[in-house]
């Protein structure tokens, strides 16, 4: 019998409601690899559910109370609400119902942990941290919020003592995670339907960092004003800072871009040394910043400079984070998850650094509430794009909000000074736009968290047809 503080191996079948979700599937995969019995349901099958079935999970298509037959515990995400037949069925049967973050915390108790939080950059930073630790021989277990190209999965089962996890702040549950090392990339107003106020959001991140043990460390980006303010509040815990600013402990210097590859040195001011000649095979200052956080932790764990340099140069990236999905007639097609104005601006700046020609941005706004709350920011975040095409809002279950739709955003972009913004209605419209507007050397960047990814992935074949 395992100790009472650890998840018992004989707990019985663990049922995930929405097992194909990017947040749930990684936990399920690690549980399967640890020998636990796992089952789950999703509204439809996917590559993720096929992978889990191949690892031994029982997968149900559709959500019904009878799927719970034999289950010992039910895991839900914050997206699962009362009225879901499996959640209601579990409670009617008296089954334990566990939130996703609580099950992740159970796994984390088996290891020492690095948890990556922040409004933007979590998934990429988690991947960078994982790949550095693999290169350093730590053999970590990884649970990420995106598909890591090196593993073709959002999870990795390692035999080492460390686990690397993405810590999701969207519902406040990241404060339940027992992190040994806490990374904070940035803090912006997002998921305010949960937090309610910027003060509550700040407190949430303060609590996240304060939860680390006395032997842990917080790694924070002081290029971001909110994070620098957070650092100023932290007492009784060790803090390592990173960024481009002259006061950061871990600082990037001599940054240049050649052919979409970042070249830079890393100044370790607290060690009085420099890791020279670093490269990262992706553009974007934000990606270099994310790499600095992983380097800060890697040095804390004792990794050597040459190991760090080699791991950064070999970084394989994450699905839907500036992912090249094709090149047709000299025009590069990029698929990216960016759906917040800060993310969009950073991605388009990276595109400008990587492109020899013009940048054409295609954006599908995600949620009416986000577009409404950040409308002026959306109107100002596309300046690095020569052409902007806006698709219909991906509602994600929300009702429309007056003044926060596709046409309003196009009008807002023009009103804010953009020279070429237009609406598109369909994939056919996108194809016509690209044929009309692009020439060899240009880059088309499709941005959003909804169905725009399918448009991006289908675009190369449409253009070849």
From Swiss-Prot:
UniProt EC number: 6.3.2.8
GO function term, MF aspect, one: UDP-N-acetylmuramate-L-alanine ligase activity
Localization annotation: Cytoplasm
Pathways involved: Cell wall biogenesis; peptidoglycan biosynthesis
Alphabetical list of InterPro entries matching this protein: Mur-like_cat_sf, Mur_ligase_C, Mur_ligase_C_dom_sf, Mur_ligase_cen, Mur_ligase_N, MurCDEF_pg_biosynth, UDP-N-AcMur_Ala_ligase_MurC
Reactions performed catalytically: UDP-N-acetyl-alpha-D-muramate + L-alanine + ATP = UDP-N-acetyl-alpha-D-muramoyl-L-alanine + ADP + phosphate + H(+)
GO annotation terms (biological process): cell division; cell wall organization; peptidoglycan biosynthetic process; regulation of cell shape
Binding annotation for ATP: 118-124
Domain of life: Bacteria
Gene3D superfamilies linked: Mur ligase, C-terminal domain, Mur-like, catalytic domain, NAD(P)-binding Rossmann-like Domain
GO cellular component, one term: cytoplasm
Family: Belongs to the MurCDEF family.
The protein's name: UDP-N-acetylmuramate--L-alanine ligase
């Amino acid at each position: 019998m395992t100790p009472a503080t650890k998840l018992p191996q004989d707990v019985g079948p663990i049922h995930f409601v929405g097992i194909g979700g990017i947040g749930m599937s990684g936990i399920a995969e690690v549980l399967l690899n640890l020998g636990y019995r796992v089952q789950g349901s999703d509204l439809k099958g996917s590559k993720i559910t096929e992978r889990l079935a191949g690892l031994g999970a029982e997968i149900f298509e559709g959500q019904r109370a009878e799927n719970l037959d034999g289950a010992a515990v039910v895991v839900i995400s914050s997206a699962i609400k009362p009225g879901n037949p499996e959640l209601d069925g579990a409670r009617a049967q008296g089954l334990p119902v566990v939130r996703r973050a609580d099950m992740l915390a159970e796994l984390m108790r088996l290891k020492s942990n690095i948890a990556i939080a922040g409004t933007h950059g979590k998934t990429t930073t988690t991947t960078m941290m994982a790949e550095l630790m693999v290169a350093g021989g730590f053999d970590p277990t990884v649970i990420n919020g995106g598909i890591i190209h090196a593993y073709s999965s959002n999870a990795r089962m390692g035999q080492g003592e460390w686990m690397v996890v993405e810590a999701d702040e969207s519902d406040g549950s990241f404060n339940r995670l027992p992190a040994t090392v806490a990374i904070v990339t940035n803090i912006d107003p997002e998921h305010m339907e949960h937090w309610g106020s910027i003060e509550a959001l700040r407190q949430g991140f303060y609590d996240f960092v304060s939860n680390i043990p006395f032997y842990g460390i917080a790694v924070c980006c002081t290029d971001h004003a909110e994070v620098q303010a957070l650092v100023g509040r932290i007492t009784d815990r060790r803090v390592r800072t990173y960024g481009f600013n002259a006061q950061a402990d871990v600082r990037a210097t001599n940054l240049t871009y050649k052919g979409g590859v970042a070249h830079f040195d890393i100044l370790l001011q607290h060690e009085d040394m420099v890791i020279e000649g670093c490269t990262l095979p992706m553009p974007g200052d934000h990606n270099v910043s994310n790499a600095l956080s992983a380097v800060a932790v890697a040095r804390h764990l004792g990794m050597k400079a040459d190991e760090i340099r080699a791991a950064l140069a070999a970084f394989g990236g994450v699905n839907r984070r500036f992912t090249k999905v094709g090149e047709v007639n000299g025009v590069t097609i990029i698929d990216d998850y960016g759906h917040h104005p800060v993310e969009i601006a950073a991605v388009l700046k990276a595109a400008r650094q990587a492109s020899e020609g013009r940048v054409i941005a295609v954006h599908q706004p995600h949620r009416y509430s986000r577009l409404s709350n950040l409308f002026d920011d959306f109107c100002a975040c596309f300046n690095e794009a020569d052409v902007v095409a806006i698709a219909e809002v991906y509602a994600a279950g929300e009702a429309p909000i007056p003044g926060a739709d596709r046409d309003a955003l196009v009008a807002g972009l023009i009103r804010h000074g953009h020279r070429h913004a237009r609406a598109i209605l369909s994939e056919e419209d996108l194809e016509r736009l690209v044929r009309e507007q692009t020439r060899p050397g240009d880059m088309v960047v499709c941005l959003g968290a909804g169905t725009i990814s399918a448009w991006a992935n289908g675009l190369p074949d449409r253009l070849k047809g």
